[in-house]
C-alpha cells in the first residue's frame, strides 16, 4: 500500500497499467477537500523585447487547452485549466478533476504543506520539528498540538 501523487500515474500508464485494475485512485486523506500542488515556471525580468516576447509565447503555449490536455495525459495529472475537455482522460483524472472543481466551489482547496505552497520554509521547518518529536518520543497528542500552536505563533 502506497500513497502517491498523480505524478506516479504517468509512470503506471507508461508501464501499461490500468486504473481500477492494477491500481486505484482515491482522494486522501479524505474527500472533504482537495490537497493540491502546482508546478510553476518563473520568468526572470528582462528589458530585452525578444526575450519578453519569448516568455509571453511560452506562457501562452503552456496554458493553451491542447498543451494542457496532451501534457497532462502523459504526466498523469489534470490540467491547470478547468475548461479543458476531459473525454480522453481516464477515470482517475476525471474524478480528480471533478473533485477539484467541487472543492474549489466550496472553499475546500488546501495547498500542499510538503511542497511549500502553504507556508514558507521557516514555518515548515518549525512544524516538522514538532511533528518529528511527537512521532519519535512519548510526547502526548495534546502536548504536540500545543507545541504546534506555539510554533505557529513564534514563526508568524
Model-derived regions: residue spans:
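Short amphipathic alpha-helical coupling segments at ligand-binding clamshell hinges
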Residues: 49-62, 144
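Structured segments of extracytoplasmic/periplasmic soluble domains
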Residues: 15, 61-65, 74, 130-138, ...
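Periplasmic-binding protein-like
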Residues: 59-85
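N-terminal alpha-helical segment
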Residues: 36-37, 54, 123-127
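Alpha-helical elements of the RecA-like P-loop NTPase motor core of helicases
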Residues: 10, 69, 125
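Extracytoplasmic/periplasmic substrate-binding proteins
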Residues: 1-51
Amino acid at each position: 500500500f502506497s500513497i502517491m501523487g498523480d505524478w506516479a500515474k504517468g509512470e503506471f500508464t507508461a508501464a501499461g497499467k490500468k486504473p481500477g485494475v492494477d491500481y486505484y485512485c482515491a482522494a486522501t486523506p479524505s474527500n472533504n477537500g482537495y490537497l493540491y500542488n502546482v508546478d510553476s515556471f518563473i520568468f526572470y525580468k528582462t528589458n530585452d523585447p525578444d526575450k519578453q516576447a519569448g516568455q509571453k509565447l511560452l506562457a501562452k503555449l503552456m496554458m493553451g487547452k491542447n498543451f494542457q490536455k496532451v501534457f497532462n495525459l502523459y504526466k498523469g495529472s489534470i490540467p491547470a485549466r478547468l475548461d479543458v475537455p476531459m473525454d480522453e482522460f481516464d477515470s482517475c483524472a476525471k474524478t480528480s478533476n471533478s473533485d477539484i472543481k467541487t472543492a474549489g466551489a466550496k472553499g475546500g482547496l488546501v495547498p500542499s504543506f510538503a511542497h511549500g505552497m502553504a507556508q514558507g520554509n521557516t514555518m515548515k521547518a518549525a512544524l516538522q520539528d514538532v511533528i518529528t518529536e511527537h512521532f519519535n518520543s512519548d510526547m502526548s497528542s495534546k502536548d504536540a498540538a500545543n507545541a504546534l500552536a506555539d510554533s505557529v505563533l513564534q514563526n508568524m
